[in-house]
Amino acid sequence: MIENWPKKPEGSQWTDDQWKAVVANGRDILVAAAAGSGKTAVLVERIIKKIINEENPVDVDRLLVVTFTNAAAQEMKNRIGEALEKVLIDEPGSQHIRKQLSLLNKASISTIHSFCLQVIRGYYYMLDVDPRFRIANQTENELLKEEVLDDILEEEYGIEDNTIFFELVDRYTSDRSDDDLQRMILALHTESRAHPNPEKWLDKLVEAYDVEGKTIEDLVYASYLLEDVKFQLETAEQHIRKATELAMLPDGPAPRVETLQADLALLGTLSSAARESWTSVYEAMQNVSWQTLKRIKKSDYNEDIVKQVDSLRNKAKDEVKKLQEELFSRRPESFLRDFQDMHPVLEKLVQLVKVFTERFQAMKRDKGMVDFTDLEHFCLQILSEQSEDGEMKPSAVALQYRNKFAEVLVDEYQDTNFVQESIIKFVTKDSESEGNLFMVGDVKQSIYRFRLAEPGLFLGKYKRFTQEGLGGGMKIDLAKNFRSRHEVLAGTNFIFKQIMGEEVGEIDYDADAELKLGATYPEGEDVAAELLCIQQTEEEVIDGEEGAEVEKAQLEARLMAQRIKAMVDSGYEVYDRKTDSMRPVQYRDFVILLRSMPWAPQIMEELKLQGIPVYADLATGYFEATEVNIMMNVFRVIDNPMQDIPLAAVLRSPIVGLNDEELATLRAHGKKGSFYEVMSSFLKGAPLEEEKELHDKLEWFYNLLQGWREFARQQSLSDLIWKVYGETGYYDFVGGLPAGKQRQANLRVLYDRARQYEATSFRGLFRFLRFIERILERGDDMGTARALGEQEDVVRIMTIHKSKGLEFPVVFVAGLGRRFNTQDLMKRFLLHKDFGFGSQFIDPRKRIKYTTLSQLAIKRKMKMELIAEEMRVLYVALTRAKEKLILIGTVKDANKEMEKWLDAREYSEWLLPDHIRAGASCYLDWIAPSLYRHRDSEMLLELGQGSIPDEIYGYDTSWKVEVVDGNTLLAPEPVQEEKQELLEALREKKAVPLQSERKDEVYDRLMWKYGYEEATSHRAKQSVTEIKRNYQSEEGSDNAFIKKLRAPIQTRPRFMEKKGLTYAERGTAVHAVMQHVDLKKPITVEVLQEQIAGMVNKELLTFEQAEEIAVEKVISFFDSDLGKRVLAAKSVEREVPFTMMLAAEEAYQDWQGKSGESILVQGVIDCMIEEEDGITLIDFKTDTIEGKFPGGFEQAKPILEERYKVQLSLYAKALEKSLQHPVKEKCLYFFDGNHVIKVEE
């Protein structure tokens, strides 16, 4: 078969491996295509060759081409179309080519989901599904899941004697909610749907916990953990061997060698036990005993070597101690008891998952909708049937597709999942050695495990297939990179040859996997790859992890901004392939890659400050945009106007336009009740002249609101939104603001979002608001509407995932010091495709919980998979660069980190030890140790080659490795220049001037005093009562010193106290009655008592307060001259709240600060009446007078007048400021004795 392949044409640009990938056939073929290797061109050429094959031409619709994205599918069709048109130019009479062009549009070149959809549309009658089904929106799907799950759990809670369910609830929920249980059910449902047979996977999960009659050696978890035990013991042995080598050096502590040899023997015993069984290791661990180190005279040996030896030995002991504590502190049989105890609970959990899946599928079926996992499973259901042995086999439909497709070509095969693999398997030939499946991908770029992609499928075939394809499938390596300069490729290879291996990384980065130079570039300047490690100084480290992250982002952003600006300003040159010449770099040539986007806004801000145009698709901030936020609040108010915060936001917005004072005035009309109730009440009455403008604004909005609420009940949501835009004029208004086009685009997106929502199974405004809340809860904010095109001359910021498949002349990879995200490993329960379910053992009755064997195994497995995934993410980032690669990371303590990274220099193998690679917590933990073994790090380290082999130390790659002081980045530019001059002078041993032009500035700063020191000892906001007390205290009437000298009043014990209201509570009750008494009705005992009873019913008074009201004293007031004036007044206002600014010297008699300072004063005026000749202010008092003053009221009057003079003066000032009318009279009314005092200034 191989001999029949066409030979590569003379002068062809295809490499031998590329040509092999184009023409090889007759078996399943796996093409491992490295980054930039031209895999898409190879794929297109292969398809064209099959179509135009003279002996056996294939129609394009007999090929199934599966791509990862719709954009890739369209690009593939375009490329094939262009290639066919070129062929047609050479063969204008070819009917076959013309036919292919006509077939191209309906050819099966699509994503796997589009192919599934095509199958389902064709064979829907084999399923219980409406042929008019639609694809569900993700948020809609989530809301449906909530509904189904709530119903199921409600039913379960209602079942009597549901013992196992309540056991499940007790173990996995908190006292407040069952959110954790809901998360478990949903997670198990999602994970199960990634398998061809979800129910079977769930059943296996339960079976794993049925350990009746088994030993610990029978458990898959124990087998895996034993491998990990061997790994950790091997790490411990490496530490001891290294310590032994150091101890045997000329200056080494030789007496330590004997003990170290004993340590090695002990570790050897443990390793032998680990190769036998779990029980053997357990028994060996119980007998671990470390010898005591012999005392030595440290001055006789090199102190650093002694420290290293002791440190390495302690690391080895810690490895063993960790194993003892985590795995071997319990007897093996106790682990088995955990599984047996958890088995019925897990069985119940899985039953709930199955019920949920069944109900969820039924609900989607009823609503005529499917999700993307349904597409895969429905397609698989059509293509498969169950054989007699219970396994899945191809159905008649699958056999039809097998006959139809001459070849199935899968792009990005490394990102395929188990279900997709099964679908592909059923439409291709059974035998790999005679197969028709062509797969292209790069497992080193498999970075979608979080989407349940399974790189193991690619790896399995890569290990199984051979280069010759004898007896099975064939693998072809496309290692030549046609994208990048030598410096980028060699730099990437140098790092990955040291960090990526099968044990840690899942694939060997061997000679076949290495990137090989395929591109030609002219000589360039400053093209070496760079590692810039920023030292975050103590002054820069902010308390808290979040603060430190903010600071790191700022430092890296500043450094990148400086470098980009410098490269652009200096005319740094990059190669332009179109003109085949070098040209000055432009902003569009730069990209900043981040693992995730939280730093992006800060980086954007910094670049903008430096005048650098920048673009990032943040996919956040849309709902935070002011115009969107205001509109969302309008819709919340339309849905439910009783919500105070949204309503206040709308009233304060430009739509209604109330200012702070008007909002406060409205609230003053009703302390109780919602804003909406107060507004409704306010609009029912006739407004005061000064409130007419406020009344008009509110009346306009109130009428609109009622119309919108009625409209919302009858019409579509999208129509309502456009109606609100039109009737408020808000859409036109935002168009006139700065960035008006952007704002209007955001409002149009909201309208479009509503239309999309209405295309779902949900309806109505309330549901829409819940729909949006769900989006925000999931963190799926949409990002503001795009106002900048991607082709603009701007620096781009994007995630590494988004950059996959793209290339840029200059690449910054930032945030390399950020810790890997290990949150998934910290969850209360863990799920794994192979190991199933793992959680802590929880006994709610004994109130104990501890780690189980399954949890330990799954956590370890997931950690190793996470490490492998992060390696692949880093590989994708580094291979985006065409000409210049700059890596940036920030550390808190560079010296401490360097000391850790320098351990790598002690090893002579290319691949760094597993424990160094597996122990990495960030990308720098891989990059820095790798580069510290290269000669170019000598500019930083000055340590020489040491024991590093020549092939590593002198590897053909160019690097600049630098530690950057964070202070120089945060300092202003002039300071940096001055510092540089001083450093240069110091290096050349020149005198440094002691004087500086900044001397005066430094002196002023050191001697500076805060100009408002007095203000720091006084409150900026005071109540009238507090100011009154302040005056009394200053005058000595409330002197704290005198209080101390008074004999303490002995209070009665509580059980002897007479129950009743306090003086303050009585006073509050009287004021409440005076506020609410109806002045239009006769003031009689019966009427007052009826009104007081009504106040109790409305909860304005308590029953106890009502009992204490002296009705006759209230009547006495209204019988008095002052009370009659109240009844006869033009207008009466009661309990009027106010705030005003007051000069600080008026509020504080001890004020020594600057004049002109103000404080905020707030208070409540009991009563004000407007008469023909002016305004009178009345303050009601419930002070005790009768019997307290020997001289009666005449003695009390001057004292009481002095006590309340300041208070009434402030009330009067507040009224005069707000009403612009003088207060003619200020009166105190005392209920005790029916006394009136007119207070004069």
From Swiss-Prot:
Pfam families: PDDEXK_1, UvrD-helicase, UvrD_C. GO terms for biological process: double-strand break repair via homologous recombination. Transmembrane segments: none annotated. GO terms for cellular component: cytosol; DNA helicase complex. GO terms for molecular function: 3'-5' DNA helicase activity; 3'-5' exonuclease activity; ATP binding; ATP hydrolysis activity; double-stranded DNA binding. Keywords: ATP-binding, DNA damage, DNA repair, DNA-binding, Exonuclease, Helicase, Hydrolase, Isomerase, Nuclease, Nucleotide-binding. It comes from the Bacteria. InterPro entries: AddA (IPR014152), DNA_helicase_UvrD-like_C (IPR014017), DNA_helicase_UvrD/REP (IPR000212), P-loop_NTPase (IPR027417), PDDEXK-like_dom_sf (IPR011604), PDDEXK_AddAB-type (IPR038726), Restrct_endonuc-II-like (IPR011335), UvrD-like_ATP-bd (IPR014016). Its cofactor is Mg(2+). ATP binds at residues 33-40. CDD domains: SF1_C_UvrD. Residues 12-485 form the UvrD-like helicase ATP-binding domain. Residues 505-805 form the UvrD-like helicase C-terminal domain. Belongs to the helicase family. AddA subfamily. Heterodimer of AddA and AddB/RexB. This is ATP-dependent helicase/nuclease subunit A. It comes from Bacillus thuringiensis subsp. konkukian (strain 97-27).
